[in-house]
């Protein structure tokens, strides 16, 4: 199995990226009632026509997409409705609750009407679901993939196709930051000066002491640690110190042997930023076990916080919060600084995590209908418009021109960061994390730590031990 995500290639796609036209389905109905015999004949004709229509619809197939991201459910529902109205092909979108995708997929895939399109999160996901992944090497959508090395491959087959290049970091409200820079004796006077952890920490702690003056409840939005709501920390944040560990030790991420164990040598750096989040927040650490991602994003949107860790996909959440006070031009990104040597040249975390797969156990007509739907989504004018404006994706396909890029501020700022001279993006290495169980256990440990019932040394040991245990479990 091969999965090669190279930052240079991802950056190239980010810089060059920004949906066959819809088929109109029409039907006419003619009714006539004269004699009883004619009526009977008409009824027979109608019955035959209905049967023929049903048979034709069955041959055309149907689509059942099991979506991974709750924040994009509304967009996918609208896209599905648009496609069905245009083509007559039924498209059902079901969205798993946050943090439950693996369990939901396991349950749904066993049903008679199983998902025809599902998602995996990289090589580890493929290892779990390869028996259900159809070979897409001959598909039109794979042909349009700008960088074929981004796909999930096994031998000569292609089993997972990436559909978006995304980025995450610390999102900040520039209006609040500008207000802070004008206070008495600020620890920095511009965002350009905040390019390492030491400066970030000084600024954040000073802002927290001036929270009332700045009109905020805390510098950072609440660190959501409710079960299923902790992925920003046990996956995205943990990626940063492990990225440096793999890089510094020249670990071959494509080698199973090379990633059997980790040292977690940058544990202190993880603690640096995690403690900064916890201690300068809207919510006290002991209460974080009930906080959701939506709660956290709402705090930012309502101007209660100045910063929040999340990705470019989060702008849809921010902009739709009732009472939102943050102007689009004030929503910007900065890297997640942790105190690593040379981090002044570190950029955002940019990569791809989720891949479309077609269920090879589904009826052939449903597999075809599902591929047709994805092809429409990423090649037709209507589909591409939905990808850009509704989903906000930067798509890795050659069907998108330079002008077909999301216009929301976070996508635009992500593109700007990826093109900065002398700045290196952090790769998404969490696609090789051992399992969802590993992530869940790390998340639970982080909550226990936040509540003061676990030491950081214990957290670090758990990360190392759980990594080794889950790598061994998934290999067996």
How would you label these PLM feature ranges?
Residues 350, 393-395, 399, 412-471:
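C-terminal capping/gating helix-and-loop segments adjacent to ligand/active sites or protein-protein/ligand interfaces
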Residues 47-53, 57, 121-178, 330-337, ...:
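Hinge/lid segment of periplasmic solute-binding proteins
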Residues 127-131, 150-190, 201, 223-255, ...:
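Periplasmic solute-binding protein
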Residues 11-15, 26-125, 138-141, 365, ...:
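Conserved N-terminal structural module of periplasmic/extracytoplasmic solute-binding proteins
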Residues 204-205, 248-290:
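Glycine-centered hinge/linker elements that transmit conformational signals in sensory
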Residues 77-81, 99-135, 144-160, 170-171, ...:
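Pocket-flanking alpha-helical
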Residues 60-62, 86-95, 113, 183-192, ...:
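A local structural motif
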Residues 86, 90, 111, 322-392:
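Extracytoplasmic/periplasmic substrate-recognition and gating elements
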């Amino acid at each position: 199995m091969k999965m090669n995500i190279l930052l240079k290639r991802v950056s190239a796609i980010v810089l060059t990226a920004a949906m066959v036209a819809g088929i109109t389905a029409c039907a006419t109905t003619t009714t006539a009632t004269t004699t009883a015999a004619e009526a009977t004949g008409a009824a027979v004709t109608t019955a035959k026509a209905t049967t023929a229509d049903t048979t034709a619809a069955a041959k055309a197939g149907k689509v059942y997409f099991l979506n991974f991201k709750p924040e994009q459910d509304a967009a996918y529902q609208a896209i599905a409705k648009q496609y069905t109205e245009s083509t007559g092909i039924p498209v059902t979108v079901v969205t798993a609750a946050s943090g439950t995708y693996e369990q939901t997929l396991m349950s749904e895939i066993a049903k008679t009407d199983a998902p025809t399109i599902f998602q995996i999160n990289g090589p580890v996901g493929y290892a779990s679901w390869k028996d259900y992944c159809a070979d897409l090497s001959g598909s039109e959508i794979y042909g349009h993939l700008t960088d074929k090395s981004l796909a999930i491959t096994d031998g000569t087959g292609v089993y997972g196709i990436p559909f978006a290049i995304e980025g995450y970091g610390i999102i900040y409200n520039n209006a609040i930051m500008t207000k802070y820079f004008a206070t008495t004796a600020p620890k920095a006077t511009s965002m350009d000066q905040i390019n390492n952890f030491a400066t970030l920490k000084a600024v954040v702690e000073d802002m927290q002491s001036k929270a009332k003056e700045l009109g905020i409840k805390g510098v950072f939005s609440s660190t959501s640690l409710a079960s299923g709501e902790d992925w920003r920390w046990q996956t995205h944040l943990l990626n940063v110190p492990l990225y440096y560990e793999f890089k510094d030790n020249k670990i071959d991420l494509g080698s199973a042997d090379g990633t059997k164990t980790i040292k977690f040598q940058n544990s202190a750096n993880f603690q640096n930023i995690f403690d900064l989040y916890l201690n300068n927040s809207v919510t006290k650490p002991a209460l974080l076990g009930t906080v959701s991602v939506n709660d956290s994003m709402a705090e930012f949107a309502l101007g209660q916080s100045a910063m929040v860790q999340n990705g470019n996909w989060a702008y849809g959440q921010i902009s739709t919060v009732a009472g939102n006070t943050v102007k689009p031009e004030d929503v910007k990104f900065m890297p997640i600084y942790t105190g690593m040597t040379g981090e002044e040249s570190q950029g955002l975390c940019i990569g791809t995590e989720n891949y479309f797969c077609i269920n090879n156990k589904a009826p052939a007509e449903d597999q075809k209908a599902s591929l047709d739907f994805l092809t429409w989504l990423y090649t037709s004018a209507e589909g591409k418009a939905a990808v850009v404006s509704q989903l906000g994706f930067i798509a890795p396909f050659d069907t998108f021109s330079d002008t077909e890029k999301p216009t929301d501020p976070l996508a635009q700022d992500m593109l700007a960061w990826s093109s900065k001279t002398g700045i290196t993006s952090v790769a998404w290495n969490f696609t090789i994390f051992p399992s969802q169980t590993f992530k869940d256990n790390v998340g639970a440990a982080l909550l226990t730590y936040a509540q003061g019932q676990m030491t950081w040394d214990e957290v670090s040991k758990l990360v190392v031990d759980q990594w080794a245990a889950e790598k061994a479990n998934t290999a067996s």
